[in-house]
Amino acid sequence: MALAFFPRGGSAQVARYLARFLPRSGWEASIACGSLGPPGAESNAASFYAGLDVHALDYTRAASAPDPLTAEPPFQPSFEDRAGAPDRVFAAVDDTVYERLVATWETQLADAGAGSADLLHLHHLTPIHEAAQRAFPGVPRIGHLHGTELLMLEAIDAGAPRGWDHAQAWAERLRRWARGCERLLVLSPDAVRRVPGRLGVEPERIVLAPNGFDPGRFDRRPLTGALRLEHWRRWLVEDPRGWDESGVPGSVAYSERDLAPFEGGGPVLVYVGRYTDVKRIPLLIRAHARARERFTSRTPLVLLGGFPGEWEGEHPLAVVRETGDADVFLAGWRGHGELAAGLNAADVLVLPSVREQFGAVLVEAMACGLPVIAVDAHGPAEIVDDGQTGWLVAPDDEDAMGEALVAAAAGDGAERSRRGEAAYAAARARYSWPALAAGLARVYEDVAAGRPPREGAGTLAHGA
């Protein structure tokens, strides 16, 4: 199993959980990946994938080099275009650097034992595919799309932005790599419909592979009353991780007086994720600020996440200052092992992202018994049953988001509880990692045995 990136986003979580649960179905997985930072950091591969067989490419020195892509080893490019970030967008990477990336990953795959593997499970569409094709042409490949590669490809097809000087070469590569995979795993029914036309692959090679949750970690363990207040005191006052425009964790901290919104017994709303443009955090903050006067009790909004120093567009703290909304809190980046505690100290998860290809945090929140508010598009539209497990709103509609916040916070909580119960049942019926890993093992067996894909898209949940 290989992915070019250091642990940061959802694809790393997927790789970690699959590698942990696949042995139950007879498959052992080694992980070749990127790494950043010292041992103990969440972005350090050995720490993040602790207990697994990990072969990591250390990007730490490259990240601070004058040109990270000419360092040794070269830093990872990105499917996202963020000004000033060390990981420049793939579409701006020239052929010389591309060849260096391929050569680097040929060596890394060899060190991880790719030559003796039954198959290669490659996350995203990156130069790892080219490295695998050149160095190990006889080992079958499974591609795993996580959505960001599709967003970059769609942007190229719509007319590449300025600075994407090598966009067409990368578009051709992504399509060629996809066509070279025996199967392509995608996150949602929406992707099942979009991918064949976008990448030029046969529909029968597509396998629906939703993200999941660990049932041993994510469950209903609600913190209420004094225990809830103590949790937020610890995360916001005693051990703050929020960060301002400096990017330094702890540069946003709160006092005991600031915790007043948590003391009245009103519901707590929580956002979990990165501070990227598609997440629409500024819209959420403004919707919350406008809804405050309509809440029947103080209803704090906690922003949990934001990889330190990484943001696009308006910084969330700047929007908080602009709106004067003292009930919005920046809790900063926490490890995935702490996420269940944060969810259980809240009442509703809110995800305003307009281009979310899946939305794993929705499933994790539902597995903790939380109803969710999300946008009626892409992955969330497939996960959330509007009116039953949560609320769906139109993309980029601040008014609709505000109405959903008011509805979720209203009354005595009976409606939240009803939808939370339905969310809990739905998550456990459809998105358990052990069951999804067992389904993936069946796909592995078909590919390793050279069986052709079956007619129509497969799915991990019901055998592929």
Question: Residues of each region from the PLM?
Answer:
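Nucleotide-activated donor-binding/catalytic signature segment of Leloir-type glycosyltransferases, i.e.
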Residues: G305, G313-G337
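Carbohydrate-associated surface elements
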Residues: D190, G212
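A conserved catalytic-core segment of Leloir-type glycosyltransferases
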Residues: S30-G115
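Conserved donor-binding/catalytic core segment of Leloir-type glycosyltransferases
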Residues: L185, A226-K279, I285-H288, V302
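Conserved acidic donor-binding segment of nucleotide-sugar-dependent glycosyltransferases
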Residues: D386-G387, W391-E398, A407-G413
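Aromatic "clamp/platform" in nucleotide-sugar-dependent glycosyltransferases that forms part
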Residues: V354
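Membrane-proximal helix-turn-helix segments that form the acceptor-binding/catalytic region
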Residues: A110, W164-L184
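Short hydrophobic beta-strand element within catalytic cores of glycosyltransferases
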Residues: P371-A374
